[in-house]
UniProtKB/Swiss-Prot annotation:
Annotated keywords: Ribonucleoprotein, Ribosomal protein, RNA-binding, rRNA-binding, tRNA-binding
Gene expressing this chain: rplE
Subunit structure of this chain's protein: Part of the 50S ribosomal subunit; part of the 5S rRNA/L5/L18/L25 subcomplex. Contacts the 5S rRNA and the P site tRNA. Forms a bridge to the 30S subunit in the 70S ribosome.
Pfam families in alphabetical order: Ribosomal_L5, Ribosomal_L5_C
The protein's name in its UniProt record: Large ribosomal subunit protein uL5
């Protein structure tokens, strides 16, 4: 079991019950999934770019990503329907907890000029979305092996009913929000 999962059950969950006055432990917000998405627009011109992006995403997530394709043709972007334009991974269960642990303890502290995560990135239903500008903040990525610095989107989906509950849940995991 991941340390953060144990921490959730032993300390975070009881604290949330006290803070919000839940009558059942099933009402306590929990993290349902973490989705990683990497848009690779350059893959239209060069097929090798997509292979590198898939390799990086596999190393970071620990599971094989799904290639996302263009839904419709856009002449301005020089893409046609069905062209591969990115990749995504949905993490649940054990891998999700392990990724969250690496994100909070290792990756976020390695972000350059970091001043805290924005509180405005909640969507109104307790889910948190963040962008990462470079994949090299993750320890699994070897700096010598990358072809290009790429960013990605990370969405943490929770069962919280509102942003206040979602923020309290993530703060329980020592998520570094701006004060």
């Amino acid at each position: 079991m991941a340390k953060l999962h144990d921490k959730y059950q032993e300390t975070v969950s009881p604290e949330l019950v006290k803070k919000f006055g839940f009558t059942s432990v099933m009402q306590v917000p929990r993290i349902e999934k973490i989705t990683l998405n990497m848009g690779v627009g350059e893959a239209v011109a060069d097929k090798k770019v997509m292979e590198h992006a898939l390799r990086d995403m596999t190393a970071i997530a620990g599971q094989k990503p799904v290639v996302t394709v263009a839904r419709k043709s856009v002449a301005g972007f020089k893409i046609r329907e069905g062209y591969p334009i990115g990749c995504k991974v949905t993490l649940r269960g054990e891998r999700m907890w392990e990724f969250l642990e690496r994100l909070v303890d290792i990756a976020i502290p390695r972000i350059r000029d970091f001043r805290g995560m924005s509180v405005k990135s909640f969507d109104g239903r307790g889910n948190y979305a963040m962008g990462v500008r470079e994949q090299i903040i993750f320890p699994e990525i070897e700096y010598d092996k990358i072809d290009k610095i790429r960013g990605m989107d990370i969405v943490i989906t929770t069962s919280a009913k509102n942003d206040e509950e979602g923020r309290a849940l993530l703060e329980g995991f020592n998520f570094p929000f701006k004060k």
